[in-house]
């Protein structure tokens, strides 16, 4: 099961992208890979 903490940490690397647009931070994949492996 995925916890709220896992979701928060996975998305935190992408918050700047979500707020400002532009390129996704390299290697972050917005936490999608981490969530899929949870």
Swiss-Prot record:
SUPFAM superfamilies: Bifunctional inhibitor/lipid-transfer protein/seed storage 2S albumin. GO terms for biological process: lipid transport. Plant non-specific lipid-transfer proteins transfer phospholipids as well as galactolipids across membranes. May play a role in wax or cutin deposition in the cell walls of expanding epidermal cells and certain secretory tissues. InterPro entries: Bifun_inhib/LTP/seed_sf, Plant_nsLTP. GO terms for cellular component: extracellular region. This is Non-specific lipid-transfer protein P2. GO terms for molecular function: lipid binding. It is found in: Secreted. Gene3D superfamilies: Plant lipid-transfer and hydrophobic proteins. Keywords: Lipid-binding, Secreted, Transport. It comes from the Eukaryota. Belongs to the plant LTP family.
């Amino acid at each position: 099961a995925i916890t709220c903490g896992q979701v928060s940490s996975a998305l935190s690397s992408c918050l700047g992208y979500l707020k400002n647009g532009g390129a996704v931070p390299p290697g972050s994949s917005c936490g999608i890979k981490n969530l899929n492996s949870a």
